[in-house]
Amino acid sequence: MTLKFGTDGIRGPVDTVVTAEACLRIGQAVGIVAKEEGWNTVMIGKDTRVSGYMLESALQAGFIASGINVRLLGPIPTPGVAYLSKSFRDHFGVVISASHNSFEDNGIKIFMPNGEKLSKEIEKKVEKILNSNLDSVNSVSIGKASRFDESGARYIEFCKATVPPEISFRSLRIVLDCANGACYKVSPAIFRELGAEVITIGDAPMAITLMITVVRHILKLLSRLY
């Protein structure tokens, strides 16, 4: 299958389109272009879909094989990856997520070091390499992988800093539905640290119930709270 970028990265079912093999190739192809652009390190974030762990491993292998260093962020909202990519010199970002698509799908979205989506020009370069024969770098030049455990904390501080000091959350009681998705940790923390009382719904990373079971029970739960 020929892989091509859509309006928001590459998306599709994980058993036919966004497969482990496809992600290995995507990692290699993007890595080759990234090296040409002078981008040396990729930050990989994801949502809570169960397939994300498989695709993360495949992408990681592809990037390392092309000589790119990898920093694994774990589950984090998509804007968090864009922000962190912009915060570090010569870093770019990849998000493993299909956003509002059903949990059977997954996708790959790429951010340039300026925090913006991959340009059309670079997408075309990647597509050309992606659908050709790919070679790995030698053992001396392969990339290295590490986990970046501060990703959530850094993004939380950034979000808090966007709130004007004259706005107070201390008198607010907020019911927050995280839909068991990528924001299940950072969103409650942001509002609590701003002073609000937070009641969470769907704050467990249960990928199969992502955006499905939460909505059914929200009215019943809210009626108990009020």
Task: Name each model feature, range by range.
Residues 32, 41-105, 190-226:
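N-terminal small/polar loop signature for handling phosphorylated ligands or for N-terminal nucleophile
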Residues 106-226:
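Gly/Ser/Thr-enriched, mixed-charge loops and adjacent short helices
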Residues 7-9, 47, 75, 96-99, ...:
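Fold-independent oxyanion-binding glycine-rich loops
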